[in-house]
Amino acid sequence: MTTRYRVEFASSRPTGKFFTARLNGQTNIFQIEWIKGLLAVPFVLHSQPTAVYQEHSENLVAVAADTHQRYAEIFRDVEKLIDDHSRPLAPPPPPVLASHLTLSVDHERNAAPGKSKLKLLVPTAGSFFSRLPLEDAFKYQDAKRMISRRRFVAPSFNDIRLTLNTAQLLGLVRGPGLDLVTFDGDVTLYDDGACLTPDNPAIPRIIRLLHQGVRIGIVTAAGYTEGAKYYERLKGLLDAVHDSSSLTPAQKDGLVVMGGESNFLFRFDSASPHRLSYVPRPEWLLDEMKSWNQEDITQLLDIAESSLRACAANLNLPVAVLRKDRAVGVYPYDRSKIHREQLEETVLVVQNTVERSVVGSRLPFCAFNGGNDVFVDIGDKSWGVRACQRYFGGIEPSRTLHVGDQFLSAGANDFKARLASTTAWIASLTETVQLLDELEEMQKAEKNRS
């Protein structure tokens, strides 16, 4: 069992770039590297890399089975830590069992979030919107990725990231169900800077979700004020929904586009030549967003623009400044490629500058690395996802899934979505398609089981 191992969270931080996965919950930042450290112990003890075996020998099969068991135990222990820390969907235990030692303490529910073992091991862990069946998720991914059979390559960052995604899907399917799926645009649904074309493999999967009655939101950083611009980027999906004979008008109405992170909402409209109609802000603004006044918005963007110009000059970046209604950013005017380190430096400088301003302390904003540009938007994707939830009648975070590719703390705009919903961290359109296929597979399995 993993209780044999001495877990030192502080020493588990790698000396290189520090990756963190945002699961579901308020301020939940669960360290993938921490889980990686836990799995490193059985890998070192049981992998047998120097043994001279035939690759299909009985000895190797036995080693793989033993390693699988050890990995599964670790994921089960972490799953129990999360249940102990925060189990929002679990019914209260019968009074007769309330004092039994094996029951979850459920510190979040009992107003003692800082006292859980998970909080002691991972101080940044917050509350969770759903359960995470990590042991079952690992067994699912192990069957696909053969993690336990590897003798020279330890469980990787991507192995754990995809296992967490699977656990999140299992938690939704087995728990409250799914009413809303929101997607990032670039990288998640199409290549960076590209468009959603008619042959995109995600389209039939999204239509399948709409057919199930699941609402769909495209929550993108692209801050256009006209539907025509979004039609250019999302034409393949919008035309497919328009032409679909299997979708009812009500199901088609379940598609919206939130632009500028959280600033412009468009609903699907079959009668519009651009398949989209602008939704006036009073129909979807959250109460907190109504206090964002134009004077503060202008002041924050002025500070951000000044910081962007200063940083571009300091780093000698070949960029132009683009000021929009609710955003400001820099992009290469000669289409040259800017180094990632320069983009991240710009993000952090601007973010720090705006955060230290008076207006930055009262007005939400998001500074992010767009791949070859840097932008600052008013609001962020947590507000965008929450606005979609409100527009569709008040969908709960526990019944919402946000799919995106940017979940690093610095310069990543999907990072904040974890405050409003459960999340899945993908790295490409291919992974998005695989995730949606996994979801369908799990839904069918759960239906057959019930």
Swiss-Prot record:
Mg(2+) binds at residues 184, 186, 405. Disulfide bonds: none annotated. It is an enzyme of class 3 (hydrolase). GO terms for molecular function: ATP binding; IMP 5'-nucleotidase activity; magnesium ion binding. IMP binds at residues 184, 186, 192, 220, 373, 381. Its cofactor is Mg(2+). ATP binds at residue 144. It comes from the Eukaryota. The active site is at 184 (nucleophile), 186 (proton donor). Homotetramer. IMP-specific 5'-nucleotidase involved in IMP (inositol monophosphate) degradation. This is IMP-specific 5'-nucleotidase 1. It comes from Aspergillus fumigatus (strain ATCC MYA-4609 / CBS 101355 / FGSC A1100 / Af293). The gene is isn1.
